[in-house]
Design a protein with these regions (language model features):
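Aromatic (phenylalanine/tyrosine) cluster motif
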Residues: 3, 11-13, 22
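Class I Rossmann-like S-adenosyl-L-methionine
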Residues: 17-345
């Protein structure tokens, strides 16, 4: 699932409102994605009650946050592996009386200032204590990943520059994460084995991790907070209200959609398209403070990934016509400011 975080209308709206964009922006996008998945599953499983489905939504969001912590511990595991390798080197040199010429790469990695902060972070330690041995079970993978990282041009350039300032240490970790962990089929496979709830979350959660790396400073100590699961209580409420409004107003919202299907019978529409439009309309009619462009663009992004190739364009046109009619009838005061570039893609 790929979101254009920096260019999304949500980003610009939250920035103008002086809200903590590093948390709210990502959480809202993740919430919308989860609501789409869970609403789709709700209709596929007709025996499921609304209360059970709501609990599943809450659990699914909790699992996404666990994935965030889980991925941060990959970096800590790599650091610990580097420390073990360097300890072997030191013991060997002590035994043989030899000495390493120049810089010892394993020591440099193990002494990385940002990774030291992460290893000592209280929140991450608490998470790891409750899940002992999670990456130790994947020792072969950690070894292979570490080898790829230390043999890479990114790491070699970092070593060659011999700039081991805090900023350089943090930046090399960010680059290495983006290059070797963000796009890693082996990690994706392991994640899927650990939890089916993590299947579609990784690309969004990777952005959480990258933002977290940038939030640390040289003065960050063990109490440095990680990103909270919800930036504000309104985000938690947003998830529950959006899901419930979508289901409870389902018949009404589907009738609205049905009225605007011109050349297609309603029954011939892709089911995912109907679900996405139903949720988008629920958001438009339930949350007055969310700008129309934000709602449009977030669900069009989801449609590009989760539905048919032409769905985004079709949904865009349908929603645009529906909202104009709703505004004309006085059911919403929202007006679309202007079509964004992604609407016409």
């Amino acid at each position: 699932m790929a979101f254009s975080l920096g260019c999304s209308p949500a980003f610009h709206y939250l920035r103008t409102q002086n809200i903590g964009i590093f948390t709210i922006m990502i959480n809202r996008e993740l919430i919308r994605l989860k609501v789409v998945q869970l609403v789709y599953a709700y209709y596929q499983n007709e025996g499921k009650t609304l209360e059970v489905a709501e609990k599943e939504l809450t659990f699914s969001l909790q699992k996404a946050y666990e994935l965030y912590e889980y991925l941060l511990t990959v970096l800590v595991s790599l650091k610990k592996h580097a420390g073990r390798k360097d300890a072997v080197r030191v013991a060997r040199e002590k035994r043989t009386g030899s000495a390493t010429r120049g810089i010892a790469p394993d020591k440099v990695f193990a002494d990385n200032k940002f990774l030291c902060q992460l290893e000592n972070n209280k929140e991450l330690i608490d998470y790891s204590e409750n899940r002992k041995g999670m990456w130790e079970e994947e020792n072969a993978f950690i070894k292979k990943l570490y080898s790829r990282i230390t043999e890479s041009d990114i790491f070699q350039l970092y070593i060659d520059k011999e700039d081991f300032s805090y900023e350089a240490d943090r930046e090399v970790v960010r680059k290495l994460y983006k290059t070797f962990i963000c796009d890693n089929d082996e990690i994706d496979a392991m994640i899927e084995e650990h939890s089916l709830y993590w299947n579609d979350d990784k690309q969004v959660v990777d952005s959480f991790v990258l933002k977290t790396i940038k939030r640390f400073t040289e003065s960050s100590d063990a109490e440095q907070p990680l990103l909270p699961m919800y930036a504000v209580d309104e985000d938690r409420e947003f998830a529950n209200r959006l899901f419930r409004a979508t289901i409870e107003r389902g018949p009404e919202l589907r009738e609205i959609i049905r009225a605007f299907t011109k050349n297609w019978e309603f029954s011939r529409l892709a089911f995912m398209d109907v679900v996405i439009m139903q949720i988008a309309l629920a958001e438009i009619l339930t949350f007055d403070a969310i700008p129309l462009n934000v709602t449009f663009n977030e669900y069009l992004d989801i449609a590009k990934v989760y539905s048919t190739p032409r769905s985004s364009s079709y949904i865009n046109g349908m929603l645009d016509n529906i909202v104009k009619k709703l505004a004309k009838d006085g059911r919403t005061a929202k007006v679309r400011v202007q079509p964004s570039k992604k609407d016409g893609e």
